[in-house]
Amino acid sequence: MAEQEFRHMVRITRKDVDGNSTIATALTEIRGIGKAFAIAICKVLDLDQDAQIGYIDDESVKQIEAVLENPQEFGIPEWFLNRRNDYETGETKHLIESDLNMTLRDDLNRMKMIRSYKGKRHEVGLPVRGQRTKSTFRHGSSVGVSRTRPTGN
């Protein structure tokens, strides 16, 4: 990694990250990349995960973007990716930023459209995964305690 002048903002896949952050921490600012995936990217590209991302060169940024574009070509295992066996295409891929947001929104809309249990729960804003609802997930205003008015003394 050749040293060059420090950049306060580094643009990686349509996202500006803080140049003062370490490489692993800066990658986690991108939606769809967690700590473990960021460390895996650093290991695959032989980058120091504790180095500041403001000092890496443009070639390293392009390599990071290439890994994010197709992680399996660089040896990242299939179980590490966040979209396995896609509903429409059957592909296994890793989604980030707006692609991830659109896919999640489409998945929710599909569940609502086919009227599945999870889709119905999402529609009415109730918990989906079987949590209790007697005391939690309450919406609306609370009813306060009424006080008796003091009699005129």
From Swiss-Prot:
PROSITE patterns in alphabetical order: RIBOSOMAL_S13_1 (PS00646), RIBOSOMAL_S13_2 (PS50159)
RNA-binding as UniProt keyword: yes
GO cellular component, one term: small ribosomal subunit
Biased composition (Polar residues): 143-153
GO terms, biological process: translation
InterPro entries recorded: Rbsml_uS13_C (IPR027437), Ribosomal_uS13 (IPR001892), Ribosomal_uS13-like_H2TH (IPR010979), Ribosomal_uS13_archaeal (IPR019977), Ribosomal_uS13_CS (IPR018269)
One Gene Ontology molecular-function label: rRNA binding
Alphabetical list of SUPFAM superfamilies matching this protein: S13-like H2TH domain
Keywords assigned: Ribonucleoprotein, Ribosomal protein, RNA-binding, rRNA-binding
Disordered: annotated span: 129-153
Subunit structure: Part of the 30S ribosomal subunit. Forms a loose heterodimer with protein S19. Forms two bridges to the 50S subunit in the 70S ribosome.
Family, as annotated: Belongs to the universal ribosomal protein uS13 family.
Function: Located at the top of the head of the 30S subunit, it contacts several helices of the 16S rRNA. In the 70S ribosome it contacts the 23S rRNA (bridge B1a) and protein L5 of the 50S subunit (bridge B1b), connecting the 2 subunits; these bridges are implicated in subunit movement.
PANTHER family: 30S RIBOSOMAL PROTEIN S13/40S RIBOSOMAL PROTEIN S18 (PTHR10871), SMALL RIBOSOMAL SUBUNIT PROTEIN US13 (PTHR10871:SF3)
Protein name in the entry: Small ribosomal subunit protein uS13
Organism: Methanosphaera stadtmanae (strain ATCC 43021 / DSM 3091 / JCM 11832 / MCB-3)
